[in-house]
Amino acid sequence: MARSLKKGPFVDENLFKKAEVAKDGEVIKTWSRRSTIFPEFIGKTFGVYNGKEFIPVYVTEDMVGHKLGEFAPTRKFGGHGDDKGKK
């Protein structure tokens, strides 16, 4: 279910402030996976925490409006079962 338009997009205030003062090429570490990507974030790199490590996410124009957490998966896919003994 989408967020109500009257509420507007959500972004963590601290994250927005960090992004404003960050230099180009600097990785901005964040735990706020729920924050919406704003147009001001284009060209910046965020280190999004996935529960184990910070995944670098370089923001492009296509990502605006999505959440930061969408680009840092939390689960590792081990693949489907291998049939090692089967011929």
UniProtKB/Swiss-Prot annotation:
Pfam families: Ribosomal_S19. GO terms for cellular component: cytoplasm; small ribosomal subunit. Keywords: Ribonucleoprotein, Ribosomal protein, RNA-binding, rRNA-binding. GO terms for molecular function: rRNA binding; structural constituent of ribosome. It comes from the Bacteria. One of its GO terms (biological process) is ribosomal small subunit assembly. Coiled coil: none annotated. InterPro entries: Ribosomal_uS19, Ribosomal_uS19_bac-type, Ribosomal_uS19_CS, Ribosomal_uS19_SF. Protein S19 forms a complex with S13 that binds strongly to the 16S ribosomal RNA. Belongs to the universal ribosomal protein uS19 family. NCBIfam families: rpsS_bact (TIGR01050). This is Small ribosomal subunit protein uS19.
